[in-house]
Amino acid sequence: MVSTTFRRIVSPCWRPFGIGEDSSPGSDDTNGRLDGLLWYKDSGNHITGEFSMAVVQANNLLEDHSQLESGPISLHESGPEATFVGVYDGHGGPEAARFVNDRLFYNIKRYTSEQRGMSPDVITRGFVATEEEFLGLVQEQWKTKPQIASVGACCLVGIVCNGLLYVANAGDSRVVLGKVANPFKELKAVQLSTEHNASIESVREELRLLHPDDPNIVVLKHKVWRVKGIIQVSRSIGDAYLKRAEFNQEPLLPKFRVPERFEKPIMRAEPTITVHKIHPEDQFLIFASDGLWEHLSNQEAVDIVNSCPRNGVARKLVKAALQEAAKKREMRYSDLEKIERGIRRHFHDDITVIVVFLHATNFATRTPISVKGGGLLSAHNPVL
């Protein structure tokens, strides 16, 4: 008998998603499709398999940006090929996430060319270069648009290259591996990313070690741990007001200013990087912003992907998270769907999901591809 819990988890696979459900393999969704506050690309091919993407908007302006790039990961024709996945969860506004979406992949390609190969050092250099570029933009716009100093983005990157998976994370987005765990072919969820959120004790300890003379480096405020009592994440690209003292002053709004002058950055942009050798039992990767993980556990997400057809599976994950969000507020999912952006943020965050299947099939392609998550949802955001 199917358990109630399992039925609830995989139910998105058994019922129609809603308006715009038509997602047959032959349908043309080259640039994705838009259905209200939902953008999705149900299926696509990368160099070693297939992928599925979905984004749902909650904020008045979409703060999540994302991309999937498959093909050369170097500026040289002789360089390696890879599949690159980026999930950029903005806060304070969309500007930093949008900037990272435009610049990080290029910077990593540039350093891959210089170093003649992929490595953790190449990725770190790409993050740091993108950070410096954005802080330069903040400097340029400081007098006319000071609020840009309070904008940042959590950045999660995955690169599949030459049989290795490189995972780089700065912030609290997450990537989870679905892996065959036993002879019965059951899939186990394995988290591959390290998160930087002050709710995690090890993150608080790291901050205290880095700032031993600051008793207020982490503060418990309204039952939530925050860096300097302001922000939950300890690493990001952007958030210039907590990295350079020159931005910790007027005309920045008082709620973003810290009372003490600081000499070294309070937040960092350098990611934590792990390298994972891909094995035959490794089936797929789920990359998602924290909006998904607020409502689904790692294992629940893996079970959904394992139980659903590949086509449209990212959209199924988004629906499962929204169903949980509605349940927590004791409302119907159909009523949640009717709530407009902005107001919707009181019920859930922007959610980005990219599912990447790892092993080559008949659907794999050597043709370079580039997909930006969000499509027309992102087009409403202001250009810097």
Swiss-Prot record:
Pfam families: PP2C. Its cofactor is Mg(2+); Mn(2+). It comes from Arabidopsis thaliana (Mouse-ear cress). Signal peptide: none annotated. May dephosphorylate and repress plasma membrane H(+)-ATPases (PM H(+)-ATPases, e.g. AHA1 and AHA2), thus influencing negatively plant growth and fitness. Residues 47-358 form the PPM-type phosphatase domain. PROSITE patterns: PPM_1, PPM_2. Its EC number is 3.1.3.16. This is Probable protein phosphatase 2C 48. It catalyses: O-phospho-L-seryl-[protein] + H2O = L-seryl-[protein] + phosphate; O-phospho-L-threonyl-[protein] + H2O = L-threonyl-[protein] + phosphate. Binds 2 magnesium or manganese ions per subunit. SMART domains: PP2Cc. The keyword Chloroplast does not apply. Mn(2+) 2 binds at residues 89, 290, 349.
